[in-house]
Design a protein with these regions (language model features):
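Helix-loop boundary and gating motifs at the non-cytosolic
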Residues: 2-52, 211-250, 317
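Helix-to-loop junctions at the C-terminal end of transmembrane segments
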Residues: 56-70, 157, 259-272, 360
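C-terminal ends and interior cores of transmembrane alpha-helices
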Residues: 80-96, 282-295
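Hydrophobic core of transmembrane alpha-helices in multi-pass small-molecule transporters
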Residues: 17, 98-118, 123, 220, ...
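Juxtamembrane intracellular "pre-TM" segments in multi-pass secondary transporters
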Residues: 1-6, 182-219
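A membrane-interface helix-boundary motif in multi-pass transporters
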Residues: 155-172, 358-382
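C-terminal transmembrane helical hairpin of 12-TM major facilitator-type secondary transporters
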Residues: 274-320
Length: 402
C-alpha cells in the first residue's frame, strides 16, 4: 500500500491510539483480574515485570534504531510479536494454569514491548513539522486510545475477566501491522562501533550533561511513587464502592486531552521546564487528594485525584520527551528516549512496584486500612524530585543542544 507522506503522518495518530488502547484495557483491570483467579499475591511481581523487561531491551533496540534499522519497521515487528505473548499470558489464566505461567509469558512480552514508547516517540519527533505544536496533538491520540480501552473493557463487563487481555492482544496485533505504514525513519548513526554502541550504553554519556542528568534523575524519582496509581488506585476504587473501576480510571485521560491541547497552544510561548514544574506540583496534589479521600471516605474525591493524572502525565512525560529532543544530537535521538523510558519505566517501575507494595501492606492491607497515611507518605516523597529539579534546572541557565 502506497501512502503519501501526509497520510503516513496521519497514520501516526492511528498507531498511537492502538499502542495505548491495549494497556488501557488490561493494566488497570489487572489487580481485579488476578483477584478473580486467586492470584492477588502475584500483583507486585506482575507490576515489576514490564520494568524488568524494559531494563533488558530498551537501550538495545533504541541503539538499533539509531544505527541499523528503520524505527517504524522495528516498531511493527515488536508490536506483532508481543501480541502473541500477551495473548498467551491471559489465556494461561483462563485455562487455569499456575499463575507463574502468566509471569513467564508477560515477561517475554515485557522484553519485546519495552522499546515501543521510545520508538514511536522517535518516529513522531523525526517526522512531524513544528514538533512543539504537533507532537502534543499526535500524543493525544494515545490518550484517546487508553480511554477507549478502559471504557470498552467496562462496557463489555470485562473488569474482572482475562478476556480483557485477549481483546487487547488482538488490537496490539493490528497496531503492529499498521506500523509498517508509518513515515520512514531511517538510522542516522553510521559511525558508532563496538559493543557499547550495540548495547546502547553510549546513552549513559548523556548523564554527564548537568541539565539532562537532573531531568533524568528527577523524572525517575517522581515515577517511583507514581507506580501506585495503576497498582493501588483500582483497589481503592473497589474498596470505596466502585462497580466500574476500569472505566473510572479513564477520567484522567479525559482531562489529559485538554492538557495536550494546552501544551500544543502554549508550548512555544513558555519554556518547557515550567510545564515540567507544573506537572510535578500537580502530582503531589494528586497524592494529597487520594489521602483526603481516605480520610473522608468519599469516592468523588478519588475521581478528582484520578482526573489530575492527565495533566501530570502530559506536563511531565510528554513535555519531558520534547525537552530531551531539543537537547540531544540526531544520532542520539532514539537512545535518549530509550534511556528516559528505561529510568522512568524500568528502574522506577521496579523500585515503585516493591516499595509501594511494601507500603501498602504496612498501612492498608491486613486490617490497617490507613489510606491517608499511605498516600501522604507518597506525597512527601514526591517533594524531593520537585525541589531537585527546581534547584538543578530552573535555577540554572538553559544548556545548548549538544
Amino acid at each position: 500500500m502506497q501512502l503519501s507522506l501526509q497520510n503516513r503522518r496521519y497514520m501516526m495518530g492511528v498507531v498511537m491510539c492502538l499502542i495505548f488502547m491495549p494497556p488501557g484495557m488490561w493494566v488497570t483491570s489487572l489487580p481485579n483480574i488476578l483477584e478473580t483467579h486467586d492470584a492477588s499475591w502475584l500483583l507486585p511481581y506482575a507490576t515489576a515485570l514490564p520494568p524488568f523487561g524494559m531494563l533488558v531491551s530498551a537501550l538495545i533496540f533504541g541503539a538499533l534504531s539509531d544505527r541499523k534499522m528503520h524505527a517504524e519497521r522495528l516498531l511493527g515487528i515488536l508490536g506483532i510479536s508481543g501480541a502473541f505473548f500477551l495473548w498467551f499470558g491471559f489465556s494461561s489464566l483462563k485455562w487455569g494454569w499456575h499463575p507463574g505461567w502468566y509471569l513467564v509469558f508477560q515477561g517475554v512480552n515485557a522484553v519485546i514491548s519495552g522499546p515501543i514508547f521510545a520508538l514511536i516517540t522517535k518516529v513522531k519527533l523525526t517526522n512531524l513539522p513544528n514538533a512543539s505544536k504537533s507532537f502534543p496533538i499526535y500524543s493525544m491520540f494515545g490518550t484517546i486510545g487508553w480511554m477507549l480501552g478502559g471504557l470498552l473493557t467496562s462496557q463489555l463487563g470485562l473488569d474482572w475477566s482475562a478476556d480483557a487481555g485477549l481483546l487487547a492482544a488482538y488490537i496490539r496485533f493490528i497496531m503492529g501491522a499498521l506500523c509498517f505504514l508509518l513515515p520512514a525513519t531511517p538510522p542516522t548513526d553510521f559511525e558508532s562501533r563496538g559493543w557499547r554502541a550495540r548495547l546502547g550504553l553510549n546513552a549513559f554519556g548523556l548523564l554527564k550533561i548537568r541539565e539532562l542528568r537532573v531531568f533524568y534523575i528527577a523524572s525517575m524519582l517522581f515515577a517511583i511513587p507514581c507506580v501506585a496509581f495503576f497498582m493501588i488506585v483500582p483497589i481503592m476504587l473497589v474498596t470505596f464502592g466502585s462497580e466500574h473501576p476500569t472505566a473510572q480510571m479513564t477520567i484522567g485521560q479525559m482531562l489529559e486531552i485538554f492538557a495536550m491541547l494546552s501544551l500544543s497552544l502554549l508550548g512555544s510561548r513558555f519554556r518547557v521546564r515550567w510545564f515540567i514544574v507544573v506537572g510535578l506540583i500537580l502530582g503531589i496534589l494528586r497524592f494529597g487528594l487520594f489521602a483526603l479521600a481516605g480520610e473522608l471516605g468519599m469516592l468523588s474525591v478519588i475521581w478528582v485525584g484520578i482526573a489530575l493524572h492527565g495533566p501530570v502525565y502530559t506536563y511531565l512525560y510528554v513535555t519531558g520527551r520534547m525537552f530531551l529532543d531539543k537537547r540531544v544530537p540526531d544520532t542520539m535521538r532514539g537512545q535518549a528516549q530509550a534511556l528516559f523510558q528505561l529510568l522512568i519505566g524500568s528502574v522506577a517501575g521496579i523500585l515503585g512496584a516493591f516499595s509501594c507494595g511494601w507500603l501498602y501492606q504496612g498501612t492498608v492491607s491486613g486490617g490497617a486500612e490507613d489510606w491517608t497515611l499511605f498516600w501522604l507518605a507518597l506525597a512527601v516523597f514526591s517533594v524531593v524530585p520537585l525541589v531537585y529539579f527546581l534547584v538543578g534546572v530552573v535555577g540554572k541557565p538553559a544548556a545548548a543542544k549538544i
